[in-house]
Swiss-Prot record:
GO molecular function, one term: 1-deoxy-D-xylulose-5-phosphate synthase activity
Protein name according to UniProt: 1-deoxy-D-xylulose-5-phosphate synthase
InterPro entries xrefs: Dxylulose-5-P_synthase, THDP-binding, Transketo_C/PFOR_II, Transketolase-like_Pyr-bd, Transketolase_BS, Transketolase_C
Organism (species): Nocardioides sp. (strain ATCC BAA-499 / JS614)
Cofactor: Mg(2+); thiamine diphosphate
GO biological process: 1-deoxy-D-xylulose 5-phosphate biosynthetic process; isopentenyl diphosphate biosynthetic process, methylerythritol 4-phosphate pathway; terpenoid biosynthetic process; thiamine biosynthetic process
Gene: dxs
Length: 634
């Protein structure tokens, strides 16, 4: 039995000796490595915050004091010392420990976040609430790993700076991606003095006395203050924070637990918001991660614990996009690539190697990415903005007002669209086809296979008077499904028997729809499967196909509310097509973490479930009654 097994809550940390705490840190790293090697997850960020997290929980009293993690993937250590060590082997498994903070798991988790740059706003609100209610509680926000490249973090800092009474401690986890390395001992000594309340009292006294001296007093104080600030600014990167009016402690070695505890205790005693700047190394304590040049094992696939070698993985959708965008870049000198701190994950790294001058990583700034793309389009370029589907939500206003309103030719490529699975509710890209339906002029494509991804990407970048979107899911693509016929701009994938059922298969659900068709054909039901390719706007040819069939069924890997099926039904209503309609999509709920296949089964987006429902509907129609839950044009 290890020491970690005896830690049921953060309170158990406070009685441990230095030697025991070192042992505990070692056990935590070992468990992190072994678990992520099998389950996958975020390893590098968590290896880098072991001592930092232990220090936070020894100095503060969670859950009375609230700890908010920005980009919650760095909360694994927090979970381990907050009672979840025994169940950590279920990390990212259905019904197991989430890869992000989860209110359902523990009272120590308050924010279920995986979107970056939000923690400071949560913390600002919490701290203000406790101040108003007269509660003596601290709020600790841990932010870093690039999250300070997001504008929302600076909006929060701008407001935090004027909330002088808020008991808010902001721990900047600087792993080399946001700030310069630590400077030295003098900076630490000066910042220790700077945040000492006694120093503040003395400074106020000196200010009052000097200002009372006629003529020279105010000037003397300003000179003294400028000298002190100038010396500190020369030694440590706190100038920007102090210019905002925030107290600053650091830099401090984030892997030195005792030093972290000392500065956190100083910050806790100060009556107001404080920045604690901790220098850490991503992947710390695991040599393969520290030597991994790309991202220090940020989120590796399954790997060998001894060597760090990742196990072979198959081809994914991202690889197809990555190859095709390079081909397009060679043919189109006006093509530029933009991403928001996701160069490798979205597959733009290959484009960057070929065309570095035409590739832009804007940091965690999706809003800026969209509007900058509009500017590039106005300047004669064609930008391709590659993001995860869930992160486009953050830039909706910019897509609508900055890109679409100005009829800019910008292509958005949405990776990890639809159900993503293991990363939980906030990573599912299940809203894009709903929110984008309201954007005038925007065209949206959903490829069913690799060949269609290449085809539709080429078509998208040819549009220079409106935004286009190409979206595809996470994981491995299916084999190419060739069309048997064409209807307008849509592909007919299956045409069997009589015109009983028209199945409209959106994007990656094409494979599912073909399977459904085989099951229906085996039961004597005639079926046509159509892939719209471009799902917005609705192709008039699909309206005519719907008019010819007895039942229309739409299948999409997107929310049912406001999605492609809902818009198709609305279009049929407007065209006077009264064919009964069945919509299959993602219900209007947040989906917990599990494998994609398990989630699709849970929500009924499997060939078996869909075919069964269609058989039931056709039976009702054959008997001369329309099922109550089949949507019907009126």
């Amino acid at each position: 039995m290890g020491l970690l097994d005896s830690i049921a809550s953060p309170a158990d940390l406070r009685g441990l000796s230095d030697a025991q705490l070192e042992q505990l840190a070692s056990e935590i790293r070992d468990l992190l490595i072994r678990t992520v090697a099998t389950n996958t997850g975020h390893l590098g960020p968590n290896l880098g915050v072991v001592e930092l997290t232990l220090a936070i929980h020894r100095v503060f009293d969670s859950p009375r004091d609230r700890v908010v993690f920005d980009t919650g993937h760095q909360a694994y250590v927090h979970k381990l010392v907050c009672g979840r060590a025994a169940s950590f082997g279920t990390l990212r498994r259905e019904g197991g420990v989430s890869g992000y903070p989860s209110q359902a798991e523990s009272p120590h988790d308050i924010v279920e976040n995986s979107h970056a740059s939000t923690a400071l706003s949560y913390a600002d609100g919490l701290a203000k609430a406790y101040t108003i209610r007269g509660e003596d509680r601290h709020v600790i926000a841990v932010i870093g790993d690039g999250a300070l490249t997001g504008g929302m973090a600076w909006e929060a800092l701008n407001n935090i700076a004027i909330a002088k009474a808020s008991k808010l401690v902001i721990v900047v986890n600087d792993n080399g991606r946001s700030y310069t390395p630590t400077i030295g001992g003098l900076a630490t000594a000066l910042t220790s003095l700077r945040t000492n309340p006694r120093y503040e009292n003395v400074l106020d006294l000196v200010k009052r006395r000097l200002n009372a001296v006629p003529g020279v007093g105010p000037a003397a104080y300003d000179a003294l203050h400028a000298m002190k600030k100038g010396l500190k600014d020369a030694l440590a990167p706190q100038g920007l924070f102090e210019d905002l009016g925030l107290k600053y402690v650091g830099p401090v070695d984030g892997h030195d637990r005792a030093a972290m505890e000392q500065v956190l205790a100083q910050a806790k005693r100060f009556n107001g918001p404080v920045i604690v700047h901790a220098i850490t190394r991503k992947g710390y304590g695991y040599d393969p991660a520290e030597r991994h040049e790309a991202d220090q094992f940020h989120a590796p696939g399954p790997f060998d614990v001894q060597t760090g070698a990742e196990k072979p993985k198959g081809r994914i959708w991202t690889d197809v996009f990555s190859e095709e965008i390079v081909h397009l870049g060679h043919r189109r000198k006006d093509l530029v690539g933009i991403t928001a701190a996701m160069m490798h994950p979205v597959g733009l790294d290959a484009f960057q190697k070929h065309f570095p001058e035409r590739t832009f990583d804007v940091g965690i700034a999706e809003q800026h990415a969209a509007t900058s793309a509009a500017g590039l389009a106005m300047g004669g370029m064609h930008p391709v903005v590659a993001l995860y589907g869930t992160f486009l939500n953050r830039a909706f206003d910019q897509v609508l007002m900055d890109v679409a309103l100005h009829k800019c030719g910008v292509t958005f490529v949405l990776d990890r669209s639809g159900v993503t699975g293991d990363d939980g509710a906030s990573h599912n890209g299940m809203w894009d086809m709903s929110i984008l339906q309201v954007v005038p002029g925007l065209r949206l494509a959903a490829p069913r296979d690799p060949a269609r991804l290449r085809e539709l990407l080429n078509e998208a970048v040819e549009v220079d008077d409106a935004p286009t979107v190409v979206r595809f899911p996470k994981g491995s693509p299916p084999e190419d499904i060739e069309a048997v016929d064409r209807a307008g701009g849509a592909d007919i994938l299956v045409r069997n028997g009589t015109k009983d059922v028209l199945v409209v298969a959106v994007g990656a659900m094409g494979t599912t729809a073909v399977d459904v068709a085989q099951r229906l054909t085996a039961q004597g039901i005639g079926v046509t499967v159509v892939d719209p390719r471009w799902v917005k706007p609705v192709d008039p040819a699909i309206v005519e196909l719907a008019r010819e069939h007895r039942l229309v069924v739409s299948i999409e890997d997107n929310g049912e509310t406001g999605g492609c099926g809902a818009v198709l039904l609305q279009t049929l209503n407007a065209a006077g097509v009264h064919t009964p309609f069945r919509l299959h999509g993602i219900p209007q709920q947040f989906l917990g973490h599990a494998k994609r296949a398990a989630i699709l089964e849970r929500i009924g987006l499997t060939p078996q479930a869909i075919a069964l429902r269609i058989v039931e509907d056709m039976t009702s129609l054959t008997e001369g009654r329309s099922p109550l839950d089949v949507e019907q044009a009126t």
